[in-house]
Curated annotation (Swiss-Prot):
It comes from the Eukaryota. Disulfide bonds join 161-227, 190-262, 194-264. Belongs to the TGF-beta family. Pfam families: TGF_beta (PF00019). InterPro entries: Cystine-knot_cytokine (IPR029034), TGF-b_C (IPR001839), TGF-beta-rel (IPR015615), TGFb_CS (IPR017948). One of its GO terms (molecular function) is growth factor activity. Proteolytic processing yields a number of bioactive forms, consisting either solely of the mature alpha chain, of the most N-terminal propeptide linked through a disulfide bond to the mature alpha chain, or of the entire proprotein. It is found in: Secreted. This is Inhibin alpha chain. GO terms for cellular component: extracellular space. Keywords: Cleavage on pair of basic residues, Disulfide bond, Glycoprotein, Growth factor, Hormone, Secreted. Its main location: secreted.
Amino acid sequence: DAGEAEEGLFTYVFQPSQHTRSRQVTSAQLWFHTGLDRQETAAANSSEPLLGLLVLTSGGPMPVPMSLGQAPPRWAVLHLATSAFPLLTHPVLALLLRCPLCSCSARPEATPFLVAHTRAKPPSGGERARRSTPPLPWPWSPAALRLLQRPPEEPAAHADCHRAALNISFQELGWDRWIVHPPSFIFYYCHGGCGLPTLQDLPLPVPGVPPTPFQPLSLVPGAQACCAALPGTMRPLRVRTTSDGGYSFKYEMVPNLLTQHCACI
């Protein structure tokens, strides 16, 4: 928005973007269309400064430190001093530009504009400390996965080979600062002996097809069968993790962790 008062005082209202306000300003220029040619500009500067810049604050207009730089004909480029960069962090910026010899132009191509160069703000002390903290050991290492082993055997309703379940809490494991979802999961594992056949966890029979008598699977003749997951039936566990305290997240998949079917192998 722009307005013009007496004695060549122009008022402009700028609204810096959220992107600009959230970053560190490294340079800023105000481009203003004077309408004056080079001779008129030189003559005006010989007697007194051609342009003056003020900012409207709650305490009234305050001067903005700046310097004039190279500019195309009929334009002026005002380079804001470093001390003025914080002005671009305000959602609304009202600038008063004094140019006694300039005239207001309604042409779109003569509209003044601000140019700001920015970069990401350096992290604060707390953020630097968080980011410099050594990363946690990779939780899916063999040593950590041993935490998911089955508990000591307890008397069960039946001792035959079957699929058992255990609720795993990532908070109890101390992984809740790394794994943010799910907070827990049901860990299935195979448990029991292979002295008697079990049909509990085998695939359901197909209608019209006679059931196949149970036979323990054996990979080595004469070897003793043990209760284990059927090959090819393990499913992955999907989790959402963070390594920087919640600033970013990553979806990960742990393969072959959840048992679906058990058998004597």
